[in-house]
Amino acid sequence: MAEWGVMRAIWQGWLFAAMVLAVGGGWATAGAPAEAGRAVPVIYCTDLFHPHDDPDDHFDLATLYAMPELDIKGIILDQGRKQLERPGRIPVSQMNRITGRNVPTVIGLATPLKSPDDKGLDQTPEFQRGVEFIVQTLRASATPVCIATLGSVRDVVAAFNREPGLFRTNVAMVLAFIGEASDPEYQEYNVGLDPQAFVGLMRSGLPVYWVPCFDGGLWQNRGHASFWRASHRALLGKAAPEVIQYFIYALEKEGSEPLAFLSRPVEPERQARLFADTRNLWCAAVLGVMSGREVVRDGGKWTCALPGSDGQTGGAGRKPLFGFSEVEVSVDDAGVVGYGKRPGSHRVRLFEVRDPAQYEPRMVEATAGLLASLGRKGAAASR
């Protein structure tokens, strides 16, 4: 055990040494600020199901839709075979109805990649649509696209392996919620879904904005993970009735017609059950980095704000709750990440909490503000 203690100290030393790397050439700051009136093209990859595995994905989807500057080109539903039985397109159709959008969905590859450079071409045609959609969207976009991935990263890596040049010229960032920041003995759930896809992503050299799910093992956050907890009452206390219905439908694994359910009156007993629950979250307001949003104090409250929306333009006057710092990482064949410059290492941007004491309550407040805007006038323009 003493030997393991030394190894852990060395591992953590790599991390802190890596954090002092100077930001140099070629990398933009996290989340290019959205210009007034200009949408940010986004491909969203998620392991969203109905009935759910974990309804945190429903909160993330709703938060994404609450940011009208994000032009969601399409949603790739992870783990295609499971999608046939438990379709994530159901909550997407509900969010489309609530916001007036018309975002398409496609299902992704069915089985894990066999190697980091696997193109997934041996999988059947019904599961190729996700990879094909990613490639087609990148080709068609006049501006670089942001890709957010919440799940296995399988379809993104297979698409990259088919068209690496296209990715290098037309991907603005890959915002990846996956992995463990500091414990080499712990394999995080999303990595376990497809270890070779994770290896492929971390070796790709793409502009990866890495958001580890944990830092220090299961349910731990030492400052480089996005994990936090919230009560449903705090998140949804000001949400519109159709948004409450959306979450009741998800949490209670409803089987009735999903769009009609949104317009039914909220039943007090079901709302009480919803509000009594709590949720583990990882994404939500963090998704705003794709358009340059930051979780900042605006007067007497914390919001997920676009640049300039709080009277600040960045710099010393604006103190975001979290951000990203550039690090050098390498990853072995088992998906274990090491820090520091070495042969085969690549630069990524690593998530960091800048105010640990305030992180959880302020993430609750900022996410609640976004969710409160859904279903209300001006919350999201049709796209």
Predicted regions and their residues:
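Metal-dependent C-N hydrolase catalytic cores
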Residues: 35-39, 44, 84-141, 334, ...
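N-terminal secretory signal peptides that target proteins for export/translocation
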Residues: 1-10
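Short, conserved catalytic or adaptor-binding loops enriched in Gly and charged residues
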Residues: 95-100, 200, 233-236
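Conformational coupling and interaction surfaces
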Residues: 37-40, 59-67, 71, 192, ...
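Boundary at the C-terminal end of the N-terminal hydrophobic targeting segment
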Residues: 28-36
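Residues in well-ordered beta-strands of folded domains
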Residues: 106, 175, 288
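Active-site histidine-anchored catalytic micro-motif
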Residues: 37-89, 116-230
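Bacterial N-terminal signal peptides
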Residues: 10-26
